[in-house]
Amino acid sequence: MRSEKKSRKFWFIAILCLIIVLPAGWYLWSRLEKEKPTLNMNLLSPHLGQSQVFSLVVSDAKSGLRRLWVGLLKNGQEAVLHDEKFPSAGFFKGGKVHETSVKIQLAPEVLGFSDGDAILRTVISDYSWRGWWKGNITYTEKNVKIDTRPPEIEVLSRAH
């Protein structure tokens, strides 16, 4: 009789644990997803003139976008071109925005950059719980060349 009560109690606790642990484990597994946000940059040329518009398409299908940051770096000087934070749908749901498109106007001289090599940086994060709720991060750097001066033509001789 006593062993039958222990057996029933054991099975009751085991089934109760499965009912709680399996859904909780599945939910944690989905919130701790490791898929990084994707970036599609439409930069026509790595050579930047006086003014140029380029577009970015960023997406994260699973947990939603948290932040998009774009900056230009040259000789230790950095200018923020775009910084956008996306809203959360709630602690348990992730982000409201899963895909967005952004057009960025880039004018190096207005930002105080002279001609030469520079780096275009992008940082995108999502609402995954990975990294102690910091999310997955996509970090890219693209080497660009700032060239704002038009070419000059000099006449070498009048003999031709």
Stretch-by-stretch model annotation:
Residues 50-54:
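Structural beta-strand segments of beta-rich domains
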Residues 1-9:
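N-terminal Lys/Arg-rich, disordered targeting/topogenic segments
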Residues 12-27:
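Hydrophobic membrane-insertion alpha-helices, especially the h-region
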Residues 6, 38-40, 45, 55-152, ...:
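Long, low-complexity serine/threonine/glycine- and acidic-rich segments characteristic of extracellular
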Residues 15, 30-33, 133, 137:
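Short, isolated positions within intrinsically disordered regulatory regions of eukaryotic proteins
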Residues 32-34, 49, 63-65:
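A cross-taxa feature marking solvent-exposed loop/turn segments within ectodomains of secreted
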Residues 24-42:
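Aromatic-capped interface at the extracytoplasmic side
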